[in-house]
UniProtKB/Swiss-Prot annotation:
<dbReference type="GO" id="GO:0019556">
    <property type="term" value="P:L-histidine catabolic process to glutamate and formamide"/>
</dbReference>
<feature type="binding site">
    <location>
        <position position="331"/>
    </location>
    <ligand>
        <name>Fe(3+)</name>
    </ligand>
</feature>
<comment type="function">
    <text>Catalyzes the hydrolytic cleavage of the carbon-nitrogen bond in imidazolone-5-propanoate to yield N-formimidoyl-L-glutamate. It is the third step in the universal histidine degradation pathway.</text>
</comment>
<comment type="similarity">
    <text>Belongs to the metallo-dependent hydrolases superfamily. HutI family.</text>
</comment>
<dbReference type="InterPro" id="IPR005920">
    <property type="entry name" value="HutI"/>
</dbReference>
<dbReference type="GO" id="GO:0050480">
    <property type="term" value="F:imidazolonepropionase activity"/>
</dbReference>
<feature type="binding site">
    <location>
        <position position="333"/>
    </location>
    <ligand>
        <name>N-formimidoyl-L-glutamate</name>
    </ligand>
</feature>
<keyword id="KW-0408">Iron</keyword>
<dbReference type="InterPro" id="IPR032466">
    <property type="entry name" value="Metal_Hydrolase"/>
</dbReference>
<feature type="binding site">
    <location>
        <position position="91"/>
    </location>
    <ligand>
        <name>Fe(3+)</name>
    </ligand>
</feature>
<keyword id="KW-0963">Cytoplasm</keyword>
<feature type="binding site">
    <location>
        <position position="163"/>
    </location>
    <ligand>
        <name>4-imidazolone-5-propanoate</name>
    </ligand>
</feature>
<feature type="binding site">
    <location>
        <position position="93"/>
    </location>
    <ligand>
        <name>Fe(3+)</name>
    </ligand>
</feature>
<dbReference type="GO" id="GO:0005737">
    <property type="term" value="C:cytoplasm"/>
</dbReference>
<keyword id="KW-0369">Histidine metabolism</keyword>
<comment type="pathway">
    <text>Amino-acid degradation; L-histidine degradation into L-glutamate; N-formimidoyl-L-glutamate from L-histidine: step 3/3.</text>
</comment>
<feature type="binding site">
    <location>
        <position position="257"/>
    </location>
    <ligand>
        <name>Fe(3+)</name>
    </ligand>
</feature>
Amino acid sequence: MGPMCLNRHMGILLKNISTLLTLQGAAAKQGRRIKEEDLSLLQQAAVVIEKNKIVWVGPQKKLPKEFARKKALRDYDMRGRTVLPGFVECHTHLIFAGDRAAEFEMRNQGVSYQEIAAKGGGILSTMKKTRASSLNDLVKAGQRRLDHFVSQGVTTVEIKSGYALNLKDELKMLQAAQKLSGIRTVNTFLGAHALPPEFKSYEDYLTFLADEVLPVVAKKKLARRVDVFIEKGFFPPEASEKYLRRAQELGFEILIHADQMSLSGGSEIAVRLGALSGDHLLQIEDKEIRKLAQSEVTGVLLPTADLYTKTKYPPARAMIDAGVRVALATDFNPGTSPTQNLNLVGLLARLEMKMSLPEVIAAYTVGGAHALNLQNEVGSLEVGKSADILCIDQDWQTLFYSVGEASEKVVFSRGKKVFGTLK
């Protein structure tokens, strides 16, 4: 807490906040072993915003006089609302064309994923539609989806490519993601998502990506992160590790779709290379959990994908108790998690993965911020951080409690109101 210099241009005062969840304690613990006290609750609080940043946060009765002057700040009366950091949605496949609803019905009728893929379905089905889609159409669909995330209180969204699987159209996907507006977005290059029909082996395709695509993505600054789907029968560990090392040489941050279907070494590679995150992690065991706990790798858990694919859930309780920092996300994609519902993610985390509500809130704020290497900017409400703020008209304990929850929300991104109405 404490003031920074307030310059002369108009700032914002959020006052009459009933309960403020700053998450300062969770941020100080880097998102590990979260307890309720780490939400750092303040009653009857206020927040001051200047130049898109938080410059003061604390009990309203302690608001410095220079911030209380009407001429200096625009007042927003929270009227007893609850205020917390905007959610960080750290794993999505937001840019794509078409849907895979017919495949969903086929899976429910007993057709295997492998059979669907053999018939030209799966990721390759989305690939065909995405390659054929115009940049403008991808932007329009992506903006609509992004706005839906914003309406739920999300202020940062990660967006992966990976549904084009060639140079021209992977760049098109990343360009579409860059054109989205309203909140902070983070691009990830996921060319290593599936094997396109133009290639016969995963190793040859990884070589193509490393030699022909990564340098172009780096030069055009279309993404700052590189992801790969390491799995038995898909991208092999050894070739994937070589590919990720090349990405690091080019200046990319790295992350891994790891140990989703089998224990295939993805999480261990993540630790060895210093990846930002290992995502999915359904199959990891005690040895992998211990290594993750001793590292800076964030475990990104995606329970709606597990729900849709009817698989087991990751061992979240064992991970958290061992000291692994975890994040939660939707894995929004047209095939295995066609949902943007944050409440469902959090509810599954509580019901199926035995996470406490404070752990879920921290995972969707501080944990997500670490997964994106944005922990110094977002995830908690502290002086100097971005004014990414969610205001709700309900008690904080109603968060991630009802799938159909419909609280009235107001959302600020970088100090600008981007959703909701305040009088």
